[in-house]
Amino acid sequence: MINDDDLCQEMLHYLRKIGKSGMIDQIVSRKHLDLKKEKPQILQKIVRESLQEELNYIASLPTSIETDDFLCIHAGIENKNDWQNAPLSSFIEKRDFQKIGHCLKKYVIVGHLPTSNFYQSQIKNDVLMDFDKKIISIDGGTGVKFISQLNALIIENDGKNLTFKNHFVQPLPIYRIKQDKFVENKESHKVSWPNFEIEILEKREEFSFCKVIHTNQMLWIKNEFIYLKNKHFYCLDDYIDHFITVHENEDVKVIGLYGKFAYIIKNKEIGWIESGYLEKI
C-alpha cells in the first residue's frame, strides 16, 4: 500500500476509512497534508520517504511465529496442513478464521478482527479463547473501535500445563456514582460492523428510534452517534442501547458525556446512565 505505486489509491482509502491515529495518519498530520487536495501518488511518496526506517523494520519481521504449542499470526491460516502454501493475504486479511477454524494440534493466536465483532448483543473487547477450535483472538480494537482496549495475553508453562492470563489497558476517566439508580432489565440491542446504515423512524431530543437497514433491528440511538453521508444515515461505530443499574459510591469509567446522558463502563458492562448521577473523582 505504501511501497507499491499501483496501490496509492488504496492508501487514500485506508486513511479516510480505517487508519485513524496510525503512523501513516500521524505523518499526514505532521506534514499538514490535505487528503482532498494532494495527488495520491505524491501523498504516497511523502509517506514512504518519511517512514522508510519504520517500513524497513516491519519488512524484516516474520509473517508468523511458531513454537511447539502456538502459532502466532495476524489474521489466521487456511484450514489445511500445508497452511504455509497460501497467499500472504490469507495471513493478514482473513475474516472467516474464527468460523472456519484450522486443523493444527496447537493454538493459533490471532488479531486483525476486534473481539467485539463476535458478540451479537454486547460490546466486549477482552481476549477471546475458543478452546475447542484452539483459536485465541487478542485484538481489543485499539485504533479501530470507538470503545477499545489494548490487550496482553500472558501464557505460563510449568512444563506440564499451560496457563492463560490476560491484562488490558483502557485509559478512560473515572467517575463516582452519587446515588443509586435502578434500571429494569431489558433486552439489549447492538449495532456493529459492518452493518452501520440505519433509518431514522422517530427523532427526539436525546435519542432517535432507528432501524438497522441490513438486520431490521430496532433500537434507540443517541443522536450524537448518528451521521449523514451521501443522503444515507449511519451509526458512528459499535453501539449498544443498554442502560445500566448503578449504586452510590461505585466507580465507573466514562466513555463520553452526551447531553443529559453518559456512556459508561461498569465492571466491563457498557451502557448508558443519566449524567446527573456522576461526579468526577
Model-derived regions: residue spans:
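Active-site neighborhood of phospho(di)ester-bond hydrolases with catalytic His/Asp-centered motifs
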Residues: 1, 72-73, 106-116, 137-141
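Beta-strand-turn-beta hairpins that frame and shape the catalytic cleft
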Residues: 65-71
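SH3/SH3-like beta-barrel superfamily modules
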Residues: 191-221, 245-281
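Binuclear metal-dependent phosphoesterase catalytic core
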Residues: 131-180, 184
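Active-site-proximal segments of metal-dependent phosphoesterases and phosphodiesterases across multiple
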Residues: 76-100
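Short, surface-exposed loop/helix-turn segments at secondary-structure junctions
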Residues: 85-93, 120-132
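Active-site neighborhood of divalent metal-dependent phosphoester bond hydrolases
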Residues: 1-62
